[in-house]
Amino acid sequence: DAQESRGLGDVYKRQPLPYELDALAPHISKETLEFHYGKHHQTYVTNLNNLIPGTEFENLSLEDIVKKSSGGIFNNAAQIWNHTFYWNSLAPKAGGAPTGKLADAINAKWGSFDAFKEAFNKSAAGNFGSGWTWLVKKADGSVDIVNTSNAATPLTTADKPLLTCDVWEHAYYIDYRNARPKYLENFWALVNWEFAAKNFA
């Protein structure tokens, strides 16, 4: 579950990573995770905890804050949610191709898994500036690729997120400098299709 935990009368905490910091190497290095998870993700958590005391949001779940807030509270809450979802979208020694009903839905939409990957890469490479590229399940049960900018997330729409790729520069700059397409190429070796399939079910 991508929900952040809260202590008793306490603040939001970062979800622990579902793997060790070096588990995604060589595709995503330990150093990237030290900065991305250890610093960027943590900063959003710290910011949110500074912003919500005394507001209508202080006792809400993270998902509810994302759905009901705007401005700085939304930006930080959504970035926490998006990052936790991204960490769960990845796994060591993962990749490969989806199976079952999710594979059927992907094939129904794009004709083949390779055609889907090409469409996803093109969408993610063309996602201007900072943002996220998502595989989502539409209300009618079909799947689609959606780009969001900055902290925006499908959580505030009728789409159900299945997996995401973080295309903020901090997700890949240490390992790939400005070569986002190279990062995307390596992303597929880490995709956690089990997580995506659970979200699709």
Enumerate the language-model features and the residues they cover.
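Feature for soluble, non-membrane regions of globular proteins
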Residues: 10-201
